[in-house]
A protein has these predicted regions:
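Conserved alpha/beta-hydrolase
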Residues: 6-26
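Alpha/beta-hydrolase active-site loop signature
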Residues: 21-25, 92, 169
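Primarily recognizes the serine-hydrolase "nucleophile elbow" in alpha/beta-hydrolase
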Residues: 38-101
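The feature captures the conserved acid-bearing segment of alpha/beta-hydrolase catalytic domains
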Residues: 78-79, 84-95, 110-147
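C-terminal catalytic histidine-bearing segment of alpha/beta-hydrolase fold enzymes
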Residues: 133, 144-147, 154-202
Length: 202
């Protein structure tokens, strides 16, 4: 769905790359994280630009995972490849899925669920920025998870914050991305410009 918002970011002078990935159950959750890591490596090799990773729902999980990735273990990219991420209605602790029908797709157990949950990973470095946006009308679990990961990461020195968007739910929050004048688009565009400027200064 995020590809429909590309023009709003282009209006702010921000280039957009929309990355697809293989879905569960064809592959596992961490296989998808690996796909996205390879995609960002390819983008770096092509553009030499630092991306701001934006994702919704499962994509929010991936945004957090890519920010928290230890890029020093990936050959051919800078160790600070991802300096900022903006997760919208993200899932940062996948353990609650174990008791739902969704686990028929993701096929996790207690150990693999914890290993796939960014909230339990070592936090990103202190100079990284992470925003978790969540709808005010979403379930308490989505709100709890956004508050939890930003609390854990900010406690570790990461510039992390939770933004609750009043009057929106898990789906209508995406309307913010369709408005070039929204606070969400402006924030993401600002992060993109800051990352680009910091890369030029290195």
């Amino acid at each position: 769905m995020l590809f429909r918002s590309a023009r709003e970011f282009v209006a702010h002078g921000v280039a957009v790359a929309v990355v697809g990935y293989t879905l569960c159950p064809e592959v596992g959750v961490m296989d998808i994280v690996g796909e996205l890591r390879r995609a960002l490596k390819s983008l770096w090799e092509t553009t030499k630009q630092t991306p701001v990773v934006v994702g919704h729902s499962a994509g929010g999980h991936l945004a957090a995972a890519l920010l928290a990735t230890d890029w020093s273990t990936v050959a051919g990219v800078p160790t600070d490849l991802v300096r900022a991420a903006y997760a919208i209605s993200g899932v940062f602790d996948v353990a609650p899925l174990l008791s739902t029908s969704l686990n028929d797709l993701v096929k996790l157990d207690a150990a693999t669920a914890k290993a796939a949950s960014p909230v339990y990973w070592p936090p990103p470095p202190k100079d990284r920025t992470f925003v978790a946006a969540v709808g005010g009308d979403e379930s308490q679990e989505f709100i709890r998870q956004s508050l939890e990961i930003t609390g854990v990461w900010s406690g570790a020195g990461v510039k992390a914050e939770c933004v609750v968007v009043p009057g929106t739910n898990h789906f209508t929050i995406l309307d913010e991305l369709a408005n070039a004048d929204s606070a969400m688009v402006a924030r993401v565009a600002g992060l993109a410009r800051a990352c680009a400027a910091s890369r030029k200064g290195t």
